[in-house]
């Protein structure tokens, strides 16, 4: 009462049954479509990685099999290759790379985006399917974020890419509809 949050508490309490239902009922995932999306993303990842390796040819050490020894997973690895190639971006944040005129910035940015999709939304995502009903039962946190917004974890359904490739995987099963 002191903070005048009665209305907020009322809204939060009213939303609780909906969150509980979402967690308990789960979310249908079209696994065949998900596998297709993952395969397409993997192909894009390989394409972006090849473009990155071409861009920084000669700056990455090779392993015993002649393959590039870097997985380009860390900023330090990317910065080291950039320095060897005579390119010095201010930093590797997307916002910074978008302002760079050097075409290598775009190559780095596209690779990192494809790598992020591969890491967060690959076949590993399917481990969240419940064995009993084949649905995803995420954990919703109504007021966990500092911003006051709700969050979702295990998995983070709010972080699913906003592309038809991924969003279409959350289709209603036959005879049902999703209302958004």
Question: Which residue ranges define each predicted feature?
Answer:
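Conserved "right-hand" nucleotidyltransferase catalytic core of DNA-directed polymerases
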Residues: 1-165, 171-177
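C-terminal substrate/ligand-recognition segments
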Residues: 180
């Amino acid at each position: 009462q002191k903070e005048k949050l009665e209305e907020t508490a009322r809204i939060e309490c009213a939303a609780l049954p909906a969150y509980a239902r979402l967690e308990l009922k789960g979310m249908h995932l079209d696994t065949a479509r998900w596998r297709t999306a993952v395969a397409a993303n993997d192909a894009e990842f390989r394409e972006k990685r090849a473009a990155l390796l071409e861009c920084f040819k000669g700056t990455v050490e090779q392993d015993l099999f002649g393959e590039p020894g870097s997985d380009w997973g860390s900023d330090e690895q990317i910065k080291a290759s950039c320095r060897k190639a005579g390119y010095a971006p201010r930093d590797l944040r997307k916002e910074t790379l978008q302002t760079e005129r050097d075409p290598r910035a775009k190559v780095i940015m596209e690779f990192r985006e494809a790598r992020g999709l591969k890491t967060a939304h690959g076949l590993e995502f399917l481990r969240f399917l419940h064995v009993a009903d084949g649905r995803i039962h995420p954990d919703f946190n109504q007021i966990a974020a500092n911003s006051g917004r709700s969050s979702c974890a295990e998995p983070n359904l709010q972080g699913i890419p906003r592309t038809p490739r991924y969003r279409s995987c959350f289709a209603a099963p036959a005879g049902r509809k999703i209302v958004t």
